[in-house]
Amino acid sequence: MADTTVEKLATEVGKSVERLIEQFSQAGIKKGQADNVSEAEKQQLLDYLKKQHGGDNAPTKMTLQRKTVSTLSVAGNGGQSKDVKVEVRKTRTFVKRDVSDAVLKAEEEAKAKAEAEAKAKAETEAKAKAEAEAKAKVEAEAKAKAEAEAKAKAKAAAEVKVTKDTSPEAEAARIEAERLKAAQEAATKRKQAEEAAKAAEKARLLAEENSKRWAEEERQRLEAERYSDHHITTSKVARAAEDSSDMDEEKRGRRARNKNTAKTKRGGKDARDGREKHMRNRSTAPESMAHGFNKPVAAVNRDVRIGETVTVAELAHLMAVKATEIIKQMMKMGSMVTINQVLDQETAQLVAEEMGHKVVLIRENELEQQVLSERDEEGGVKLEPRAPVVTIMGHVDHGKTSLLDYIRRAKVAAGEAGGITQHIGAYHVETENGMITFLDTPGHAAFTAMRARGAKATDIVVLVVAADDGVMPQTIEAIQHAKAGNVPLIVAVNKMDKPEADIDRVKSELSQHGVMSEDWGGDNMFAFVSAKTGAGVDDLLEGILLQAEVLELKAVRDGMAAGVVIESQLDKGRGPVATILVQEGTLRQGDIVLCGLEYGKIRAMKDENGRSITEAGPSIPVEILGLSGVPSAGDEATVVRDERKAREVALYRQGKFRDVKLARQQKSKLENMFANMTEGEVKELNIVLKADVQGSLEAITDSLMGLSTDEVKVNIIARGVGALTETDATLAAASNAIMVGFNVRADAQARKTIENESVDLRYYSVIYNLIDEVKAAMTGMLSPEFKQQIIGLAEVRDVFKSPKLGAIAGCMVTEGTIKRSAPIRVLRDNVVIFEGELESLRRFKDDVNEVRNGMECGIGVKNYNDVRVGDQIEVFETVEVARTL
């Protein structure tokens, strides 16, 4: 029998894969989505779920009730017929003998009987041992006495010198002694036999007594099972609901009985007749079967329109019922939900149909699916080989651009010596063995976006490593990107013409990160090239084509095109321009393109050399004009038939993007972190921490980690010494973290990323303020926040000496306004080195209260003379910000 995967098992039981994997983990089994599940693991999970939901004890008796409703047409008065509903109820009871209890009782009986027999045997052996010891003692005394008598006789015989005693008195004494000895032995044996018989009788009586008691207990258990009732539902919630219904029914019967009893307490003959009638009614039918008249209420069946997701409260509003009714219905179906819990479309459909309503399913992206399904591929499934798409990666100054320039000059025709426009970021070259498409993307942003969206636009990664520099941080990052995208990696060792080139060092450093050359037993191809002389470039291209043959890259050439956006920009004269790498089909001028959040009709197409073209096949990069806006790098581009529908899909995607952006703004900030704790799981507050010195960093880290509780955990995902960089901001945005700067500031690139990603950035100068505010956020009782707002920034251009004031900084105000009354900080390389106040603020020898942006001024810092050229003087003010939950 084939093994069942976790994904297939989740489909069978009607649960999500994530929920099933979580239940496997709780049961002590680690599984992934594609892992197989054995029968033993299924049984282990079932036992764990039964234990969690109180389903360990299987029912020994269950009652099934079946109700059938039919309609009978009955002739009425005046020849008119009317429909009468006939309801038939059937009850069947099934009794399951509990074999485990009988086996347990039998084991207990055998154990008790064995214990009784062992006890009796031990007592008998102890008594026999004591008697044997007494007998041995008597025999020893008799033997000693006999020896003494023998010695006395021998002495007497020696004295009288008689060799044989033939006197009758001696013979009689000997015979009497033998008789007494035999009688004593017989009495001892008889006594032992009597004791053994008594012990055996006692053990038999004890076993008989226990057997009667066990039989009585078994009879009582069977009698109790005979009159007991077990429900088929093992869920605690469902049993509680049924028990509550039974109690309500019993209370109604009790109230009816009390009412009848109250009527009969008036005395006399009527009271006696009432009691007799009451007893007769009790004997004939139970109270719950009494007939009554209820005003008929027609059930309203509605058409419920259900989207992809809906909450319990929204579903109740759609069906015009209370939310508690839906919660009860879900409890009967074996699921425990809350009023704000989100239900998937299938679950909501089952609940609505169970409550008698008609369900109309709504697909929110139905139009998008319809537009994409209308794409026909004229070539059918005919696949043809295509050129490989190669991404060049490497550390800065390792010769990546030089290598690309040499390949371009060597492989592009002489008439195209002008080369390509570098901002396009993609081009293809023709070799003797085939065509290769290169992606020249600065950094790894486009590659990461494409990998995250599953576009698989890159087939091979060429890692450029300088032979004289070795592995650097961006080299390691490129290796991680290639491994995460499951893309083959070819290493190009550049700068081989330099005398400092060390091949073994490069191989050794790369092997530490999982990249092994074929010479060392690995599977990564190494090419040793020189972008300056061109040595080894042909070998690199042959290696790329060889790897492409192994991958067997194929694509559909005919039909409507589909691709991915490599780069996009807004040109002042041409409008939105997008560079698209065609992955399948043929892209033609005049096609309607749906590209992420944008759409449009292709007005013009250009290749990487800037020449106009009319069509482009697979693995060909092309520039297109005519989109409604600038798409994002990594968006999928698809050719559709109808421009009106393409516009509707683009508008729908823009609306969804706005919803996602609003949701991202509710990420883990200090103001709403405690509000996110809606479930009983442990929440994490992610923090990116930067400080000015290592000592402060360690102190803050230890203090923050000590704030972790059972409900909230502080997780410092990155920490370091120095200014906040763009890498820190990107990491904080990806992990929903807050950025904390202790006496450091963020640079310009980091501030831009922080603003675009809406990352929460905090500056502190006192460790106690940092700890207290994080603690206040974790407890959910945040006091009003005093925020330091930077109002001006001045750059020191020159330093003058004053006999009265000391060092005077000649500054240019670059941002905001410098005020005399506001406190200041002195920054050197974006690190706070002094915090104080202004002593003097002058402009053209005149004291002024403030100096605005773009003006020069002289600043004297109180109690600080170590001002240097290039320092920054930051002016801030403390403002109170009302905090909302």
From Swiss-Prot:
Residues 419-423 are annotated as: G2. SUPFAM superfamilies: Initiation factor IF2/eIF5b, domain 3, P-loop containing nucleoside triphosphate hydrolases, Putative DNA-binding domain, Translation proteins. Keywords: Cytoplasm, GTP-binding, Initiation factor, Nucleotide-binding, Protein biosynthesis. Pfam families: EF-G_D2, GTP_EFTU, GTP_EFTU_D2, IF-2, IF2_assoc, IF2_N. Residues 494-497 are annotated as: G4. Residues 253-266 have a biased composition (Basic residues). InterPro entries: DNA-bd_dom_put_sf, EF-G-like_DII, EFTu-like_2, IF2_assoc_dom_bac, IF2_II, IF2_N, P-loop_NTPase, Small_GTP-bd. Residues 530-532 are annotated as: G5. Residues 123-289 are annotated as: Disordered. Residues 385-554 form the tr-type G domain. This is Translation initiation factor IF-2. The gene is infB.
